[in-house]
Amino acid sequence: MSAVLSTENGLILKLYIQPKASRDQIVGLHGDELKVAITAPPVDGQANAHLVKFIAKQFRVAKSQVIIEKGELGRHKQIKVINPQQIPPEVTILLK
């Protein structure tokens, strides 16, 4: 499976998360996953909440439309984005 998979109602992203980074950004491919750096520390779910907010902003959807399907407690996550309004260029490249 590639890092980005298109489904009927959205996208499924396989992510590798780097918490406590200097800034929030989609870095690029990391093996067969998309690397995302976020500023939040991995404490008490702060990183997950921050990741959902960041992904929602990047894809221009509500936070409720970003669902962590797998990897709640680890760096490797699978996220579903329902009906994205915009797709960032880093992700568009991987869809082709």
Curated annotation (Swiss-Prot):
GO cellular component: cytoplasm
InterPro entries: DUF167 (IPR003746), YggU-like_sf (IPR036591)
Disulfide bonds: none
Classification via Pfam families: DUF167
Chain coiled-coil ranges: none
Assigned protein family: Belongs to the UPF0235 family.
HAMAP family xref list: UPF0235 (MF_00634)
Protein name as catalogued: UPF0235 protein YpsIP31758_0827
Organism: Yersinia pseudotuberculosis serotype O:1b (strain IP 31758)
